[in-house]
Amino acid sequence: MLISNEWLKEYVTIDDSVSDLAERITRTGIEVDDLIDYTKDIKNLVVGFVKSKEKHPDADKLNVCQVDIGEDEPVQIVCGAPNVDAGQYVIVAKVGGRLPGGIKIKRAKLRGERSEGMICSLQEIGISSNYIPKSFESGIYVFSESQVPGTDALQALYLDDQVMEFDLTPNRADALSMIGTAYEVAALYNTKMTKPETTSNELELSANDELTVTIENEDKVPYYSARVVHDVTIEPSPIWMQARLIKAGIRPINNVVDISNYVLLEYGQPLHMFDQDAIGSQQIVVRQANEGEKMTTLDDTERELLTSDIVITNGQTPIALAGVMGGDFSEVKEQTSNIVIEGAIFDPVSIRHTSRRLNLRSESSSRFEKGIATEFVDEAVDRACYLLQTYANGKVLKDRVSSGELGAFITPIDITADKINRTIGFDLSQNDIVTIFNQLGFDTEINDDVITVLVPSRRKDITIKEDLIEEVARIYGYDDIPSTLPVFDKVTSGQLTDRQYKTRMVKEVLEGAGLDQAITYSLVSKEDATAFSMQQRQTIDLLMPMSEAHASLRQSLLPHLIEAASYNVARKNKDVKLFEIGNVFFANGEGELPDQVEYLSGILTGDYVVNQWQGKKETVDFYLAKGVVDRVSEKLNLEFSYRRADIDGLHPGRTAEILLENKVVGFIGELHPTLAADNDLKRTYVFELNFDALMAVSVGYINYQPIPRFPGMSRDIALEVDQNIPAADLLSTIHAHGGNILKDTLVFDVYQGEHLEKGKKSIAIRLNYLDTEETLTDERVSKVQAEIEAALIEQGAVIR
């Protein structure tokens, strides 16, 4: 948003320089990205009056002009502009003057004729061609009103000004208008803001006699109003208005269109002006477009509409694409006499979808997308009527034709001085706090210690108590908040917390296992929001997402990790091993904050060990991924168990839940072949753990045991079992019959194929025995081994 200092002074008076004002605004939360000085690099630029023009004797395209620049005698200037003529007031750069780009004006001879100065175009004094009126695109600028020769040309053009460029965050849509900015500045300087004139001299003829308004869907169009102005004269707008539009980055067109744009910038309320006689009926019907319906917009482009688009119609034919662009046949032309002014509130989501789909971004659509201040809708239309009466000789009909409800102008929020003081860390009196709210233009009501703040609709960023607290701190001045030393119950300076220490240990374990840490977006598409979720709970969706791919808060880290793996594989990095520790989000009831839970997730695909001279490659499989998870459990001194599970998105026969103290804390498995193929991945294994749950159980140390004094003993066993029997069931049986000498087990081979019956698999398991009190004997181990084998046979296994 470009804010002209000259224009701003119309609403609020301050003594600070523009640079000081810009610094103060930046310190309170709105970043001033640039300060544009239209007088920079310009010297000796005055108004001139062309007294005579004669053809150059030796050049067909040059003219010799005698120009009055307020001195004793006219000066002779040779000019090649096609539109120069006697009787014009023009911009003259005097000898010794300077123009943007380092151009210095000197006396010269052009084809033998003396030239003492330069008659300038707007481009030559630094105005972008994008914003120059079309009538002056290819020639010098000619003043439409009489001027005094010799006066400062920049003053005459209303360009002796400095303009602040705001870099606004989406929540501060109120600063997308001059009045919204004036409220902000008035609050910063504790001064009054003067609003512009909106009252017109109205005819006795009522607009209700000439027009009706109907809204078919008030969910999409809560309010629509129109006023009528007759007998307007289409001509250039005043110089001061053109200058303000140019400084705001808008090209002047004519007085009627310029007034529409001027009020848009002034109030932040988009308006649209129709040629009343071209509408084709006395009714305006606001509805959603019919599927396949077409209309031609002001840019002479035929648009095919969808049912999600909102259109303004004459009862049958669309005459405007609501909130985005008008239609061609109802636009204001030079012959236009009667005007219908539209002021409305449209659904922000619908406007955003339409403008994005059609690639029609405009000053109007950008404001509708962020939400309109209901308090300004009718006032902005009245302001346009006043300006049309003043600068287009219009006759304003009385009454407003409207449909729907404007909605609330204010939002009441209760707060106390104690709440504010506890949050900002120092004491302000209730009176000081109320004064700050009044500076912002917020009315207040006081009931004992409760302050009810009536927040106007223009401040859509203020919805809760904490927003009010921020406003108090901003306007009081962050720089003026007294410095205090923090008070800690327990000082941990230079020391990791227990949580930080454990998290660092886990990261080191995973990095040691060959995984790289990833950090991905918390926002996912609505389709991915519940993918792999361990809790069946409602998602948290954004009201106005920047894109469909980032519309909801995630309930799992895996969707983006899968996307990251696919991205790497597509770029020839086929061996991908990633992990992430991040937050997932689950909605609670209305008005309640969501739950934020920290998860640990990982993804592995390709080769775990690349084929090198040291040894053969090792491809990622289920047991390798499980080994990574087991390393985490060992480091945190936890004992995981595994249970077969069916989880959407994972292979039905290679998936397990991870249990801790008989509670599910995660899962591990192979990505479903279909999902893997959709992402151009080969066999891929993933795991996800509720990291908060692990941290709640984990102790901050590892229980160490002395190195055994007696040797252990290992036995291998090969089992042929039904392919649907999980290895975890077999291991559970083994440990149940292993007594106190079976210390651990390891699945080291799984085979299916030749030499085995269909539907069977072979599993090889290593059993490690140890007695810490005495040396094991073969007889003792064989006895336990026999009991284990008997139990396995009873379970249906065949000992190979």
Curated annotation (Swiss-Prot):
Metal-binding listed as a keyword: yes
InterPro entries recorded for this chain? Answer: aa-tRNA-synth_II/BPL/LPL (IPR045864), B3/B4_tRNA-bd (IPR005146), DNA-bd_dom_put_sf (IPR009061), Fdx_antiC-bd (IPR005121), Fdx_antiC-bd_sf (IPR036690), NA-bd_OB-fold (IPR012340), Phe-tRNA-ligase_IIc_bsu (IPR045060), Phe-tRNA-ligase_IIc_bsu_bact (IPR004532)
Where found in the cell? Cytoplasm
Q: Does the keyword Calcium apply?
A: no
Major site of localization recorded for this protein: cytoplasm
Occurrences of domain FDX-ACB (ranges): 708-800
Protein EC: 6.1.1.20
Q: Which PROSITE patterns match?
A: B5 (PS51483), FDX_ACB (PS51447), TRBD (PS50886)
Superkingdom of origin organism: Bacteria
Q: How is the cofactor bound?
A: Binds 2 magnesium ions per tetramer.
The terms describing its cellular component in GO are: phenylalanine-tRNA ligase complex
Short name of one Pfam family: B3_4
What GO MF terms are annotated? ATP binding; catalytic activity, acting on a protein; magnesium ion binding; phenylalanine-tRNA ligase activity; transferase activity; tRNA binding
* Catalysed reactions, as listed in the record: tRNA(Phe) + L-phenylalanine + ATP = L-phenylalanyl-tRNA(Phe) + AMP + diphosphate + H(+)
Listed GO biological process terms: phenylalanyl-tRNA aminoacylation
- Keywords on record: Aminoacyl-tRNA synthetase, ATP-binding, Cytoplasm, Ligase, Magnesium, Metal-binding, Nucleotide-binding, Protein biosynthesis, RNA-binding, tRNA-binding
- Where in this chain does the entry annotate a coiled-coil region? none
| Residues binding Mg(2+) | 461, 467, 470-471
Q: Where is each tRNA-binding domain found? A: 39-154
What is the uppermost EC class here?
Answer: ligase
Q: How does it assemble?
A: Tetramer of two alpha and two beta subunits.
Instruction: State the similarity comment.
Output: Belongs to the phenylalanyl-tRNA synthetase beta subunit family. Type 1 subfamily.
PANTHER family registered for this protein in UniProt: PHENYLALANINE--TRNA LIGASE BETA SUBUNIT, PHENYLALANYL-TRNA SYNTHETASE BETA CHAIN AND LEUCINE-RICH REPEAT-CONTAINING PROTEIN 47
Q: What is this protein called?
A: Phenylalanine--tRNA ligase beta subunit
Organism, per UniProt? Staphylococcus aureus (strain Mu50 / ATCC 700699)
Q: What lineage does the source organism belong to? A: Bacteria, Bacillati, Bacillota, Bacilli, Bacillales
